[in-house]
Curated annotation (Swiss-Prot):
UniProt entry tagged with the keyword Disulfide bond: no
Protein name, UniProt field: Glutamate--cysteine ligase
GO terms of biological process kind: glutathione biosynthetic process
Membership in a protein family: Belongs to the glutamate--cysteine ligase type 1 family. Type 1 subfamily.
Broad enzyme group: ligase
UniProt KW Transcription keyword: no
A GO CC annotation given for this chain: cytosol
Record field: catalytic activity: L-cysteine + L-glutamate + ATP = gamma-L-glutamyl-L-cysteine + ADP + phosphate + H(+)
InterPro entries: Gln_synth/guanido_kin_cat_dom, Glu_cys_ligase, Glut_cys_ligase
Superkingdom, taxonomy of origin: Bacteria
EC id: 6.3.2.2
Gene that encodes the chain: gshA
Keywords: ATP-binding, Glutathione biosynthesis, Ligase, Nucleotide-binding
Length: 521
């Protein structure tokens, strides 16, 4: 059943200011391609952008071809979107012959074997980041690792948690913030499938993308692509950005200590599969950081992550254990192909509303069996979410209801939260977002996945992609800087390059010593 939040809404209506300073941040990945939609395999242009190791706002993900744009956190949605646009414009204007691939699923037609792993210089820190990516390549292959997405970082203000504690937990030793975020995460797994339903934008792939992958999907063929007629986000499926560690670690998100222990178990538990890959190659060079279930905590691919800022050389598990959960990272957003920066304001506003709802709605602790039961609902949405009258389970007793009924029920709840947030800014932005998106459940042709699939059916993946990335290149070029200036970005480029050199000079350990000290405990 969908939890009732009426009493919590009344409480929020009496205390609206506790939502005043929500902090948000965005991370957007984008592949560099040429005019033909072929991935560019040249080295990351450090001389034009800055150091991928130390730049505050622009870096690389898995490969030299896969850019990552990072905004600082801010309480203003407009600020982070303008900031994101500024960094896109800077790179766009500096890489004259290059384009940002506008989809999550990478173009696969050429040169997959020659994709270059990201390089971060000669420091131990830089080398271990490259080694981690080498391990990912051996474990999961190149294609999975160059899938692009958008991550949304979200945290509620401290004053919210202070008020929340007064009505929930009298025990001063109780970590209200961490427990509140864990409640959010459990509800996110129960109901967060609305995100790929509304915003999923990877309904089709190229045949090469699934080559040598075992699956039971009955793909249809058209225009050189494979697609599922009702799918929303193949990126989130078992063909995309996933691994099997989540099943072996028995995650439930019932307590912080339980989650930290699961992370540490993944880091320390040997994997027969990864041991068979070997730790070293024939020349004695490392192939991966270790042969355990996880090389680092970042390898645990989930739809949402509890996060805490890291101190120098600190692991995520240590940071969470020592200081609790500071924010959550939403990882279920595909690249939005209908905007030049991969994400738009409506998506941010919907996520704000839904994540607040996930905190307000009661979320009892769950078993590992229940957790995987919820994942099955995600799988249904991901692979056939737009199918007419499609039903999903609403509890483990096989009670079902339609996606439309459940989705609209949640959106009606979000209207109440929208009214409160809009009252803080004297506009109707959140309410308008709800009014627009609730229609998607009755009219799935409005969803991103169906709109994109219709374009693919007419023009194919490459022509659709080219039409979009050429348009966005011109749009970004014509845009003016709003938050950052060109001078700011040039200064950060030079500063980051100098910072990388300084880190390289300060190393005192050789690489094996460094690896043993920080990664083989």
């Amino acid at each position: 059943m969908i939890p009732k939040i009426y009493k919590k809404i009344k409480w929020l209506q009496s205390n609206p200011l506790i939502l005043k300073k929500i902090l948000r941040g965005i991370e957007r990945e984008a592949l560099r391609t040429d005019i033909h939609g072929t991935i560019i395999n040249t080295a990351y242009p450090q001389d034009k952008i800055g150091s991928a190791l130390t730049h505050k706002w622009i870096t690389t993900d898995f490969s030299e071809s896969l850019l990552e744009f990072i905004t600082p956190t801010n309480a203003s949605t407009n600020y982070i979107l303008k900031f994101l646009n500024d960094t896109h414009k800077f790179v766009n204007d500096n890489l004259i012959q290059e384009y940002f691939w506008p989809f999550s699923i990478p173009p696969c037609k050429k040169y997959m074997h020659s994709i270059k792993l990201s390089k971060y210089g000669t420091s131990n820190l830089g080398q271990v980041k490259t080694l981690y990516r080498k391990g990912l390549k051996h474990r999961y292959g190149i294609l999975m690792n160059i899938i692009s997405g958008v991550h949304y970082n979200f945290s509620l203000p401290r004053i919210f948690w202070n008020h929340w504690k007064k009505i929930h937990h009298k025990n001063t030793q109780y970590n209200t913030t961490s427990e509140g975020y864990l409640c959010l995460i459990r509800n996110y797994y129960k109901f967060g499938w609305i995100i790929p339903y509304l915003f999923g934008a990877s309904p089709a792939v190229e045949p090469l993308f699934i080559k040598n992958k075992k699956h039971n999907y009955k793909f249809k063929k058209h225009h050189g692509m494979l697609y599922l007629p009702w799918s929303t986000s193949l990126r989130l499926s078992d063909l995309g950005h996933t691994n099997q560690s989540i099943k072996k670690l028995k995650l439930t998100f019932n307590s912080l200590s339980e989650y930290v222990l699961a992370l540490e178990h993944g880091i320390k538990t040997p994997s027969k599969q990864f041991k068979n890959l070997g730790l070293y190659d024939q020349f004695g060079n490392f192939k991966q950081i270790n042969t355990n279930l996880l090389q680092t905590e970042n390898e645990l691919y989930t739809y949402i992550r509890p996060k805490q800022k890291l101190k120098n050389c600190e692991s995520l598990s240590a940071a969470l254990r020592n200081r609790g959960i500071e924010y959550v990272e939403i990882r279920a957003l595909d690249i939005n192909p209908f905007t030049s920066t991969g994400v738009d304001k409506n998506q941010i506003l919907l996520l704000d509303l839904f994540l607040i709802w996930c905190v307000l709605a009661d979320s009892p602790k769950i078993s590992s069996q229940e957790f995987h039961f919820f994942l099955k609902n995600w799988h249904t949405i991901i692979t056939k979410g737009r199918k007419p009258k499609q039903k999903i389970n609403i509890n483990i007793y096989n009670t079902k209801n339609t996606i439309q009924t459940i989705g609209k029920t949640i959106l009606y709840d979000l209207f109440y939260i929208a009214e409160i947030l809009d009252s803080l800014s004297n506009n109707n932005n959140y309410q308008e977002t709800c009014k627009n998106l609730i229609l998607y459940f009755d009219y799935p042709e409005l969803t991103y996945s169906e709109k994109l699939l219709n374009k693919f059916m007419c023009y194919g993946i490459y022509e659709t992609g080219a039409n979009l990335f050429v348009k966005y290149k011109q749009k970004l070029h014509n845009d003016s800087f709003k938050i950052l200036s060109k001078k700011d970005l040039n200064n950060e480029m030079m500063k980051s390059n100098n910072s990388q050199k300084l880190i390289e000079k300060q190393d005192t350990l050789n690489f094996k010593e460094y690896l043993n000290l920080y990664y083989t405990k």
